[in-house]
């Protein structure tokens, strides 16, 4: 990136002149957070430069400055106006990626021979990851499709390794992958199969880049058992808040629309509540039923209901809380319901809030101050077009669409803080209820009170790419200084990077200069413009004057992505139709597509990827911290995310935290509400005449008057009037009317209707599809836009599809298009509503809703449920289940079907419908999930801890896991055993480091003799070493490190003066050299060699002297020149065990210099080994804890602290935490520090925490008389501890699972990195197995078997008791004219809770051919003693569904309803009716019962053997007596595929039951043997439904020819039963004497021939 300049050559020449007399000022500007592996810009300037200046920029590691991480060069000269930039890129090394503390680098710019150096914070953020799932919600067993978009900081695609984890709602990872996007162009496409047995709730996909694991991006999806709704509901309050003084309450509009756009008719149940933090208070009295007509309804929360529902019932107690509203909308047909909720409607005293979040906190005296006032509604949304005014100055403005108003205030030439109060000025709001807010702005501090200022201002407009922004530079300086200012340098920061650098020149005398800035897509979503000028002020000081401004840009893509219609415009499309999509995108872009059913977003719209979400993530990563300006020039740079350093000492503060400083939060002021008198609710005045009239009305339940009066709520006067009239007036009979009914399908079907076989059912109903990535867009046009036309076939759903697109391009980055909607519908269709799952053998009702959207045409329709042997229903293999109905124009009819699922699994339910006299039809085939009976049980079989080191034998742990006890398992169901393995990550207990700030006293200037200099140098060396090791310079002061290193260099140089010719050291040159002091110099210099340049030759010569001059043959070191300053030698001062302690001390010093001197001193290794042998031999005799500790460290360095030496060392410790001598605090700190180093050398991390804790508790921070050794050793040991101790214990487990049903063992390796990952193996076999574990660390083995267990006892309904019966109506009942008969339906229900159930619903489906008596329903729902609140039937159509609303259901007595139902046409088989009761409050609390005139409980007939059932509703077999049957007929039929057996039998016994008949037969001849290994003369049981009794007419003692199919064999061998069904042949075989009769002769001959043929020849193949 090169800086831009003004066009004038003259200005350039002027700029190249020296700005003022004196030295030029060199400046370096970088972002104050540099990102690893990312290109960053460094701005370099020479103000007042001359000639050509060579500049190099080098980035070093911090603090050591040993590595060059990046190096770039440039020139500053008159051609570039002495302004240039370089681009640096810092590689991600292991040290920089460490998660211990914040990491920094040192950036050094060298201008000729002038160095400018700055320490800069680095960020490990590699870029962004955005995750898109194909849907927001999934069912168990389905597949999550997802894409991960890998982009850098500019949102451009990047190829990197990404780790992706899927986590359960409990945060347990179950899948972890690493994927590279290197050749994927930034788009990773992945999938995950959700198990059938899975935790419901919100799951997470988490992703991070390999080189920045601490920066995790995530997306959520929900797992739930659900069925997509057919419509959506929105709740829109008339205002986005509730104004506490509003007497009219809160109005909420309910909008309900089908997903294909048509309006919904139905009923909404609405309840309001108050949210107080996490607590919800439900306002039970607000529960109302709202009719939804043409898609709209309105619910009102009355003010009094709101006040009465909370404690205390005062308006001021509600302020600050919010209102929520829940609505459940039920379709008129009762076939579908949708719940919706709106939360966070704030209760407020003022409808608006004022914020100053977009206003700078600093102003320039006597210059305009731009106040950006942000006004919001109480829900946080922008408040548009609200007038605002400042108090005092009375400046007015109006908020724009984004809620922001700009108010420019002229400030006075004072340096006092500026207090500004802003208030709204909205009409119709009392003065006391207007919003007000006060802020204080502080004056910008100029250097040395020079009063030189710069003010940047921008107009308040919504900026879009392509527009030009005029930035005004306002200058205010002393007129004499103005001529010195020739230019402003400006920088633009965007997305944490320097986007643009340039100069804006000014002519003399110009107070205002305008920079026209062209906005490009790179400026999205916002940017900061920082500008400054520099001059030498009147006092001769170099000064920098700066300002900044934050500018918002309209959030949109940086590029282009549009999905639209590429074919002819159509309002609606038909299912399965081909449509053309046109995709417009940037050149070279790759576009990821998905089409999602809008019903998915009705259930969950939280987790969609949008462009807004992308910008939110990017804005959060902004390194700037304020809306602009700053406390002074340095504050302007820092707050904008920049760091500045100049050669003349002007610089910004050090940034040490990636997060912006958070302002302290203020507590809300208590709001005093004006006391107001509350409106009282009006009293209900009873109408006594109405009470009397109602008493005279007919009551279908025939209750006595006293019982009826109990339902009256209107008071005693009304009860008296009601009873008086009820008891003396005869009942009025009212005529029944009929508006239409189901008609029976005629057998002589008309020709003008499409046959069922020709109707192709719709069967493709995916919730999402079109999951594809497009790469082959056409060549770009002149605007750089590429297009693609895609032809796709729509799926079969009647809905609206949202087509979502996300693109990624190399130049324009990531872009999320606005969703493109495709609506699919037809004017006649079936909506088949199936539950998520049904239970095998349990009768259920499903509904097919037939819609007619024709404008003015009623449709006569034949509808049919197709036969499927997996279900028992009125559709059988022999008889179709057809009905004819009429659907009025723009209406719908619900057709209920009762079915019994017979088999577990996924089975198809298919309904077809055709319209008479039109070529219009529709069919729907959907899959229904049938689950086993009983309850799903998760049985924990075993939970074992895996810890082979402690629980195993020889390092191997074996666990035998038994099979689960499944004695209560439902027959014919599977079990699944899950074997779960998880590592147990055990954290290593670590102690905190000593706070670096406490070490400031240790940084000191060394001086004095050879001993005093070391006493002065020691604390600084060890303090710098400790702060380096614990990453604490940011606390201590990053700039102090350089100063400390200078002091170490000084001490080093001074110490060399005391080096004798022999290379040994003493206090003075003339004194004999000291062994201890020389060894100590080696120790300190060896450590300092990591910090400053130390001459290794000098150091190693000193080492040689120690070995050659002072070590005896037995390894001991001797002292011949004791030190003068005995206080510096610490515990060595004690004369006991001196040989051992000196030898250990020197050995340690030599070992610490080993890395530097090993190559130069050949004898170093031997010398250390000899000294070690000496210590080893004398260790057992030691008595002093000090000597035990120092010698232990020396031995541990050589790996010799083992066995009894280790035992002695550990036993010497007091309380296992210190090596202590009486009354010797400093010696004890020193000795315990040596002991800690010994433990660390042995990697014994479990023993170290108490030792470190003891050292920390001494609160010893070094310094003071006699502290040299204690200071050095305590900080050396604690630094080593922080460096060495791992943050966790080792975990490396190998686990193998040996399942008998598998050939080989399943193996898993558990490492620390993946410890929390839940590994699982599944098996369908319930068997005993073995688990074997080896290795280090801990894990957990859990074994869970999931199966369906039988329910104990009959399951009652949830929370409701329900009885339903139907009986013939008395002869006296008056029938409607065209009714064939009448019956009375009795429904009794009782709530099983602790109190009455409010707002309950009876959903009743009628038996085929029946309709309810409308007058009865009117009577029940009107009058003061009404039993039902309201009833609803399908408008203008067949009354085959009825919904009754009850205000309450008693929990003490049964509430009963009775009403007549009339039969309008006869049908061969009457399908049972169903009654369901449920409470609005809890839709799961349901109870369902069936009814039928002939079947008790209204249940379809099933044949059951043990726990397995089959349908018996099919027609009986054809009894072969009617027509003559030939020999050929018998042979053909008996040899049909599927026929299993052919027997001659004799009936010996009949058992006639209520439902089924059993016939015991003896097998007399096996004509064709089948699956049953039956022998002649054995008995077998034949079973038939009672409906077939008359058709069969079997006689005891008679013989029969019987054959049947294998599917009619029942039970297990040897006790097999035979079902007599539609495929069974039963033919009377005449007795021998009957064969003599002429009429039987032919049959007897044929039967004999048939038997012979079958036995001799069998069936032809």
Curated annotation (Swiss-Prot):
SMART domains: A2M, A2M_N_2, A2M_recep, ANATO, C345C, Thiol-ester_cl. GO terms for cellular component: cell surface; extracellular space; protein-containing complex. The record marks 745-747, 953-954, 1302-1303, 1319-1320 as: Cleavage. Residues 691-726 form the Anaphylatoxin-like domain. PROSITE patterns: ALPHA_2_MACROGLOBULIN (PS00477), ANAPHYLATOXIN_2 (PS01178), NTR (PS50189). Gene3D superfamilies: 1.50.10.20, 2.20.130.20, 2.40.50.120, 2.60.120.1540, 2.60.40.1930, 2.60.40.1940, 6.20.50.160, Alpha-macroglobulin, receptor-binding domain (2.60.40.690). The keyword Signal applies. Glycans are attached at residues 938, 1649. The record marks 1661 as: Coordinates Mg(2+) for interaction with Complement factor B Bb fragment (CFB). Residues 1-22 form the signal peptide. Its main location: secreted. Disulfide bonds join 557-815, 625-660, 691-718, 692-725, 705-726, 872-1511, 1100-1157, 1357-1487, 1388-1456, 1504-1509, 1516-1588, 1535-1659, 1635-1644. The modification Phosphoserine is found at residues 38, 70, 670, 967, 1320, 1571. There is a cross-link at residues 1009-1012 (Isoglutamyl cysteine thioester (Cys-Gln)). GO terms for biological process: amyloid-beta clearance; B cell activation; complement activation; complement activation, alternative pathway; complement activation, classical pathway; complement receptor mediated signaling pathway; complement-dependent cytotoxicity; complement-mediated synapse pruning. It holds the Pfam family MG1. GO terms for molecular function: C5L2 anaphylatoxin chemotactic receptor binding; endopeptidase inhibitor activity; receptor ligand activity. It is found in: Secreted. C3 precursor is first processed by the removal of 4 Arg residues, forming two chains, beta and alpha, linked by a disulfide bond. During activation of the complement systems, the alpha chain is cleaved into C3a and C3b by the C3 convertase: C3b stays linked to the beta chain, while C3a is released in the plasma. The alpha chain is cleaved by the serine protease complement C2b component of the C3 convertase to generate C3a and C3b following activation by the classical, lectin and GZMK complement systems. Residues 1516-1659 form the NTR domain. (Microbial infection) Interacts with BHV-1 GLYCOPROTEIN C. In absence of complement activation, the C3 precursor is first processed by the removal of 4 Arg residues, forming two chains, beta and alpha, linked by a disulfide bond. This is Complement C3. It comes from Bos taurus (Bovine). The lineage of its organism: Eukaryota, Metazoa, Chordata, Craniata, Vertebrata.
């Amino acid at each position: 990136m090169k800086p831009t300049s003004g066009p004038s050559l003259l200005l350039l020449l002027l700029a190249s002149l020296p700005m003022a007399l004196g030295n030029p000022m060199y400046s370096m500007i970088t972002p104050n957070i540099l990102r690893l592996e990312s290109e960053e810009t460094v701005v370099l300037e020479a103000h007042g430069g001359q000639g050509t200046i060579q500049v190099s920029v080098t980035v070093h590691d911090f603090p050591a400055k040993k590595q060059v991480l990046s190096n770039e060069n440039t020139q500053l000269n008159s051609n570039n106006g002495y302004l240039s930039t370089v681009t640096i890129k810092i590689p991600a090394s292991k040290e920089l990626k460490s998660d211990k503390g914040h990491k920094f680098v040192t950036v050094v710019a060298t201008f000729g021979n002038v160095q400018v150096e700055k320490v800069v914070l680095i960020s490990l953020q590699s870029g962004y990851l955005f995750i898109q799932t194909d849907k927001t919600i999934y069912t168990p067993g389905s597949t999550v499709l997802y894409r991960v978009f890998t982009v850098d900081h500019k949102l451009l695609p990047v190829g990197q390794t990404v780790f992706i984890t899927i986590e359960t709602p409990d945060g347990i990872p179950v899948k972890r992958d690493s994927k590279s996007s290197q050749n994927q162009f930034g788009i990773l496409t992945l999938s995950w199969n959700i198990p059938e047995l899975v935790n419901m709730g919100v799951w997470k996909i988490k992703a991070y880049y390999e080189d920045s694991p601490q920066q995790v991006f995530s997306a959520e999806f929900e797992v739930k058992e659900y069925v997509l709704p057919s419509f959506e509901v929105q709740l829109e309050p008339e205002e986005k808040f509730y104004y506490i003084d509003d007497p009219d309450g809160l109005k909420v509009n309910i909008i309900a629309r089908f997903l294909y756009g048509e309006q919904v008719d139905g009923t909404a149940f609405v309840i309001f509540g108050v949210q107080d933090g996490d607590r919800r208070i439900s306002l039970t009295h607000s529960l109302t039923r709202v009719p939804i007509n043409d898609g709209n309804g309105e619910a009102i929360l009355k003010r009094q209901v709101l006040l009465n529902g909370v404690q205390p019932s005062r308006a001021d107690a509600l302020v600050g809380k919010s209102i929520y509203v829940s609505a459940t909308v039920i379709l008129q047909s009762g076939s579908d319901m949708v719940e919706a909720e709106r939360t966070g409607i704030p209760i407020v005293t003022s409808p608006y809030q004022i914020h100053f979040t977009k206003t700078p906190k600093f102003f320039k005296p006597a210059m305009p101050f731009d106040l950006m006032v942000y006004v919001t509604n109480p829900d946080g949304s922008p408040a548009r077009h609200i007038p605002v005014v400042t108090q005092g100055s009375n400046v007015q403005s109006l908020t724009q669409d984004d809620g922001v108003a700009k108010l420019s205030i002229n400030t006075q030439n004072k340096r006092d803080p500026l207090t500004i109060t802003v208030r709204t000025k909205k009409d119709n709001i009392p003065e006391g209820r207007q919003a007000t807010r006060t802020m204080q702005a502080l004056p910008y501090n100029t250097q040395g009170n020079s009063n030189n200022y710069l003010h940047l201002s921008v107009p308040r407009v919504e900026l879009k790419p392509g527009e030009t922004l005029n930035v005004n530079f306002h200058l205010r300086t002393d007129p004499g200084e103005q001529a010195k200012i020739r230019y402003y340098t400006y920088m633009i920061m965007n997305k944490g990077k320097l986007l643009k650098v340039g100069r804006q020149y000014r002519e003399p005398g110009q107070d205002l200069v305008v920079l026209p800035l062209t906005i490009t897509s790179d400026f999205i979503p916002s940017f900061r413009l920082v500008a400054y000028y520099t001059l030498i002020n009147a006092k001769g000081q170099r000064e920098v004057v700066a300002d900044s401004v934050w500018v918002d840009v309209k959030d949109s893509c940086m590029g282009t992505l549009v999905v639209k219609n590429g074919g002819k415009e159509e309002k609606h499309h038909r299912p399965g139709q081909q449509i053309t999509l046109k995709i417009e995108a940037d050149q070279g872009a790759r576009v990821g597509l998905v089409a999602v059913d809008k019903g998915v977003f009705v259930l969950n719209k939280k987790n969609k990827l949008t462009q807004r979400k992308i910008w939110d993530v990017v804005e959060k990563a902004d390194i700037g911290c304020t809306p602009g300006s700053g406390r002074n020039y340095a504050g302007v740079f820092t707050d904008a995310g920049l760091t500045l350093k100049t050669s003349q000492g002007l610089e910004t503060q050090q940034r040490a935290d990636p997060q912006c400083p958070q302002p302290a939060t203020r507590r809300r002021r208590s709001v005093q509400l004006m006391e107001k008198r509350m409106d009282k609710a009006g009293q209900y005045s009873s109408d006594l005449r109405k009470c009397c009239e109602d008493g005279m009305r007919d009551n279908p339940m025939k209750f006595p008057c006293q019982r009826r009066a109990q339902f009256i709520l209107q008071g005693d006067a009304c009860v008296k009037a009601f009873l008086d009239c009820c008891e003396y007036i005869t009942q009025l009979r009212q005529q029944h009317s009929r508006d239409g009914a189901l008609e029976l399908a005629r057998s002589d079907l008309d020709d003008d209707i499409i046959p069922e076989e020709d109707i192709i059912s719709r069967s493709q109903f995916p919730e999402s599809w079109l999951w594809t990535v497009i790469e082959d867009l056409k060549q770009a046009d002149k605007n750089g836009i590429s297009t693609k036309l895609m032809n796709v076939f729509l799926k079969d759903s009647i809905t609206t599809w949202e087509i979502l697109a996300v693109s990624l391009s190399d130049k324009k980055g990531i872009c999320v298009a606005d969703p493109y909607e495709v609506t699919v519908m037809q004017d006649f269709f079936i909506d088949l509503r199936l539950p998520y799952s049904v239970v095998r053998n349990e009768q259920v009702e499903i509904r097919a809703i037939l819609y007619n959207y024709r404008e003015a045409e009623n449709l006569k329709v034949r509808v049919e449920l197709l036969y499927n042997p997996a279900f028992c229903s009125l559709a059988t293999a022999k008889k179709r289940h057809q009905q004819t109905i009429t659907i009025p124009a723009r209406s719908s009819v619900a057709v209920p079907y009762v079915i019994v699922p017979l088999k577990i699994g996924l089975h198809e339910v298919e309904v077809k419908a055709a319209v008479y006299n039109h070529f219009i039809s529709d069919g729907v085939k959907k899959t229904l999930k049938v689950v086993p009976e009983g309850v799903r049980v998760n049985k924990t079989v075993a939970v074992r801890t895996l810890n082979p080191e402690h629980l195993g034998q020889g390092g191997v742990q074996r666990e035998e896991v038994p099979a689960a006890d499944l004695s209560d398992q439902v027959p014919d169901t599977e079990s699944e055993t899950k074997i779960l393995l998880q590592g147990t990550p055990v954290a290593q207990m670590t102690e905190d480091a000593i706070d670096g700030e406490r070490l400031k006293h240790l940084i000191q200037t060394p001086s004095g003799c050879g001993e005093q200099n070391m006493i002065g140098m020691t604390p600084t060396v060890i303090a710098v070493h400790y702060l380096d090791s614990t990453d604490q310079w940011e606390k201590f002061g990053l700039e102090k490190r350089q100063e400390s290193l200078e002091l170490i260099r000084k001490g080093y140089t001074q110490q060399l003066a005391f080096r004798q010719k022999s290379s040994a050291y003493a206090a003075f040159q003339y004194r004999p050299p000291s062994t201890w002091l020389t060894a100590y110099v080696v120790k300190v210099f060896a450590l300092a060699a990591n910090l400053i340049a130390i001459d290794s030759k000098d150091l190693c010569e000193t080492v040689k002297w120690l070995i050659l001059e002072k070590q005896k043959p037995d390894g001991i070191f001797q002292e011949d020149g004791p030190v003068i300053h005995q206080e510096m030698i610490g515990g060595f001062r004690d004369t006991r065990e001196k040989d051992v302690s000196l030898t250990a001390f020197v050995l340690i010093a030599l070992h610490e210099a080993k890395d530097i001197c090993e190559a130069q001193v050949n004898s170093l290794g031997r010398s250390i080994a000899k000294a070690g042998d000496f210590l080893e031999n004398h260790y057992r005799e030691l008595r002093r804890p000090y000597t035990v500790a120092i010698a232990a460290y020396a031995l541990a360095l050589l790996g010799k602290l083992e066995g009894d030496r280790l035992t002695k060392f550990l036993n010497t410790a007091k309380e296992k935490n210190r090596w202590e001598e009486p009354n010797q605090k400093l010696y004890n700190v020193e000795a315990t520090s040596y002991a800690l180093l010994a433990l660390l050398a042995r990697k014994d991390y479990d023993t170290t925490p108490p030792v470190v804790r003891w050292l920390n508790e001494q609160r010893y921070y070094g310094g003071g008389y006699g502290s040299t050794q204690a200071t050095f050793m305590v900080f050396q040991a604690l630094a080593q501890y922080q460096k060495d101790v791992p943050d966790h214990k080792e975990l490396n487990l190998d686990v193998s699972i040996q399942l008998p049903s598998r050939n080989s063992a399943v193996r898993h390796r558990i490492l620390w990195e993946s410890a929390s990952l839940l590994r699982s193996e599944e098996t369908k076999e319930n068997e005993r197995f073995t688990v074997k574990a080896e290795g280090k660390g801990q894990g957990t083995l859990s074994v869970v078997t999931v199966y369906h267990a039988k329910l104990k006892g009959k399951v009652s309904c949830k929370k409701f008791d329900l009885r339903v019966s139907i009986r013939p109506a008395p002869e006296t009942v008056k029938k409607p004219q065209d009714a064939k008969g009448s019956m009375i339906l009795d429904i009794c229900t009782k709530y099983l809770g602790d109190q009455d159930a409010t707002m309950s619903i009876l959903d009743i489906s009628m038996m085929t051919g029946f309709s309810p008596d409308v007058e009865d329903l009117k009577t029940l729902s009107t009058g003061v003693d009404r039993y039902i609140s309201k009833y609803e039937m399908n408008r203008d159509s067949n009354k085959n569904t009825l919904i009754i609303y009850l205000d309450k259901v008693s929990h003490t007595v049964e509430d009963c309803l009775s009403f007549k139902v009339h039969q309008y046409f006869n049908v061969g088989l009457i399908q049972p009716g169903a009654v369901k009761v449920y409470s609005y409050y809890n839709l799961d609390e349901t109870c369902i019962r069936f009814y039928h005139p002939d079947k008790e409980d209204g249940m379809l007939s099933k044949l059951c053997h043990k726990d397995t059932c089959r349908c018996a509703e099919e027609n009986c077999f054809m009894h072969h007596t009617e027509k003559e049957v030939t020999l050929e007929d018998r042979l053909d039929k008996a040899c049909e595929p599927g026929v299993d057996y052919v027997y001659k039998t004799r009936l010996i016994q009949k058992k006639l039951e209520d439902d089924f008949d059993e016939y015991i037969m003896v097998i007399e001849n096996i004509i064709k043997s089948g699956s049953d290994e039956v022998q002649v003369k054995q008995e077998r049981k034949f079973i038939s439904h009672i409906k077939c009794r008359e058709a069969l007419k079997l006689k005891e003692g008679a013989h029969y020819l019987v054959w049947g199919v294998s599917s009619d064999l029942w039970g297990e061998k040897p006790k097999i039963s035979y079902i007599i069904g539609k495929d069974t042949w039963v033919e009377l075989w005449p007795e021998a004497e009957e064969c003599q009769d002429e009429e039987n002769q032919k049959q007897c001959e044929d039967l004999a021939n048939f038997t012979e043929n079958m036995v001799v020849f069998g069936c032809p193949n």
